[in-house]
Amino acid sequence: MKISLKLFLGTVLVFWNVENFFDYRTESTLSGKNWTAGRFYSKARGVGKVLLELAEEKGEAPMVVGLAEIDSPKTLKAIVYSDVLSAFGYRFVHYESHDPRGIDCALLYRNCRVVTSRAIPLTFEGKVVPSRDLLYVEFDSLAVVVCHLPSKRGGSELAGKRRERAMPMLDSIAGTCSKRLIVMGDFNEERREGETLTHLCEVEPKKGTGSIKYQGRWEMIDRCMSTDTSGIRLEVAVLEALSERDKRFGGYKPLRTYSGPRYLGGLSDHYPIVMEF
């Protein structure tokens, strides 16, 4: 696939939760699921093909790609060095987090220089939360935070409090950042009515848009916030290659990698979100 030559003067960023993307050698994490080398490299190449398709559509390969549910640098290398993506020269930033399952946030980047980066653990009542750390990466003219906040599934009151605590942490980071800050990630809940922060504003997607489908309902839990939302356009990349027919609720839904122990061969239960400005 060749990148089109149409004029493009903006910046493209992507965030994608790639659903439990573990190195196939991490046997203890995916025991019983037959997560083989073939399936691992097929998924890595599939992620690369999606980024290539977005590059073709936008006329420019994404400058920054935030990823959630990545387990190690080996997984990131499999993505950026795959035959479909290697020509773009992506590099990556990754830190081991405090998540008990070993899944972290990561960031791919190209054609830009990292000034500084760090992992910022979530804290609650003075203690580090056993969850994914916030990933802060600063470039010459832009700063990015990639996040994957505690899950809401199961109705855990503690998880809800931890998730709520993350919002002022993100706002505090924004308040001390001298550059335009983009926060992208899986917030594990939709924006709450009346939710306001001092330094960050929500980038609104099109109405009726969702990045996941849960019990037949579309939810926009993969979100973007910024210290300056002017000119930022946000869309969900609903690609045919990422979808399957929803036999239970009708319509379509993301084609995930596994449903329980059953291998489906998809890439994720989330669609990527794309930001342009």
What are these regions (language model features)?
Residues 12-22, 118-119, 141-151:
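Active-site-proximal beta-strand elements of phosphoester/diester hydrolases
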Residues 72-74, 100-102, 152-153, 188-194, ...:
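Active-site environment of divalent metal-dependent phosphoester hydrolases
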